[in-house]
Regions:
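Juxtamembrane intracellular "pre-TM" segments in multi-pass secondary transporters
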Residues: 1-7, 186-257
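Helix-loop boundary and gating motifs at the non-cytosolic
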Residues: 2-55, 250-293
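Hydrophobic core of transmembrane alpha-helices in multi-pass small-molecule transporters
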Residues: 18, 95-111, 339-353
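Transmembrane alpha-helix termini and helix-breaking/packing motifs in multi-pass membrane transporters
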Residues: 35, 147-168, 279-281, 386-397
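C-terminal transmembrane bundle of multi-pass solute transporters/carriers
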Residues: 46-47, 56, 71-74, 272-397
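C-terminal ends and interior cores of transmembrane alpha-helices
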Residues: 79-92, 323-335
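Cytoplasmic helix-loop-helix junction between adjacent transmembrane helices
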Residues: 102-143
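Symmetry-related core transmembrane helices of the 12-TM Major Facilitator Superfamily/SLC fold
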Residues: 165-182
Length: 397
């Protein structure tokens, strides 16, 4: 690809991850809602609404990325994220908050699988796809460090209040949108827009043409638009059909997605419930933010360490991560806040240790044409597991 600087593209993707996930309001949304007077039951229902909306949007958003292009889909994701924050600022009751939460889920869905697909295809376009292992590890580490840093700012977000906190998220969302616009699209997608035109020039030219030429040109323009619409429709159909056949005939991919979702759901919910259990276990509330930050560093470490074991069989990752998550789950019942924090650290480490390897494995298995769609199927599987596990673990813990 001419004039394509792969290093610049990858660095922009790293920067995008760093900017996108520094959301001080998003990282402390539970505490902000509680501060506004919402009950834990209402917050739990809103969490379910997020995952239900996510499960509805996940696969269609992947199809959109495969059909219209990764860059456009990422730009739409950032725009929807900004609108979600704006909706949260304007919300004044449970219904409007639920609407904002659903919009937030759509933003995550549009990004899920898309940034990974763009990174992989960028490297593949210059025959450097073997470097995706290192990219995935570093990207996951940046995501965890950034999101953990945002969590560390939870006290600051509460001090600011939800409106100012979400305004800061909007600011970083606009920066992220600017970064997306500077990215290079890789694959030759057929878009929905045509060539740019100058209306005044077109009108002047038409006046000098004969009526026959005008009619012929209009017919050609109409035919081109019809062909474009047919191509988009066919691409939607082909992506969905081929993705379905891939999942139906690839038992290994299905198994990988399910196991990854189960381990990831347990780890995620352990961290979620520790936000409530740590203060009850005697941890000073002022230390809650730093405690969550430390646990998040476990995930960053797990994402980075996985790069040192590229030749391990996938079963080894499953066994090690499974043991780590089970230990984390057990430590939440110790009653000792420091053991619980250690458990959260271990669980986060195990989760991302498996997650990064799963991402690499699936990208190697998936055809480029359906990459975003099938990675979205992976996220969809996680959402379904979360809907069930949230209630189950909530009753146990």
């Amino acid at each position: 690809m001419r004039n394509f600087n792969i290093k610049r593209q990858i660095n922009k993707l790293y920067t995008l991850t760093t900017v996108s996930y520094f959301r001080i309001a998003g990282a402390s949304w539970v505490a902000l809602l509680a501060l506004r007077g919402f009950s834990l039951l209402q917050i739990g229902i809103l969490e379910s609404i997020f995952h239900i909306a996510s499960s509805c949007f996940e696969i269609p958003s992947g199809v959109v990325a495969d059909v219209f292009g990764r860059k456009r889909t990422l730009a739409l994701s950032k725009l929807v994220s900004v609108l979600s924050c704006l909706a949260m600022i304007l919300s004044d009751n449970f219904g409007t908050v639920a609407f904002a939460i659903a919009f937030s889920a759509l933003s995550y869905n549009l990004e899920s699988g898309t940034i990974e697909a763009l990174a992989y295809d960028s490297l593949k376009s210059v025959r450097q796809e073997k470097k995706y292992n290192r990219y995935a590890s570093t990207e996951m580490m940046l995501y965890r460090v950034t999101s953990s840093t945002a969590t560390l700012c939870a006290g600051f977000a509460l001090w600011l209040g939800y409106k100012k906190a979400y305004a800061i998220d909007i600011f970083f969302g606009m920066i992220a949108l600017g970064i997306v616009c500077s990215l290079r699209e890789i694959s030759g997608f057929t878009g929905a827009d045509g060539q740019p035109t100058n209306p005044q020039t077109d009108e002047h030219n038409k006046e000098q043409m004969s009526e026959e030429k005008q009619e012929r040109m209009n017919e050609e323009e109409t035919d081109q638009k019809n062909i474009q619409n047919i191509r988009i429709s066919e691409r939607f159909q082909n992506v969905v059909t081929e993705s379905w056949h891939f999942m139906k005939n690839n038992r290994k991919a299905r198994s990988v997605m399910i196991v990854n979702a189960l381990i990831g759901a347990v780890s995620t919910l352990v961290l979620f419930f520790l936000q409530a259990k740590l203060p009850l276990a005697g941890l000073n509330e002022a230390l809650l933010g730093p405690a969550l930050f430390v646990m998040g560093l476990g995930a960053a470490l797990g994402a980075k360490v996985v790069g040192y074991f590229p030749n391990w069989k996938y079963k080894k990752y499953i066994i090690l991560s499974g043991i780590g998550v089970l230990c984390a789950f057990g430590m939440t019942f110790s009653g000792n806040p420091y053991l619980m924090i250690l458990g959260g650290f271990v669980g986060s480490f195990a989760d991302d240790f498996l997650e990064v390897r799963t991402d690499i494995l699936l990208n190697d298995m998936i055809p480029s044409e359906q990459r975003a769609t099938l990675i979205s199927v992976n996220s969809f599987t996680f959402s379904l597991v979360m809907i069930v596990m949230s209630t189950l673990m909530g009753s146990i813990m």
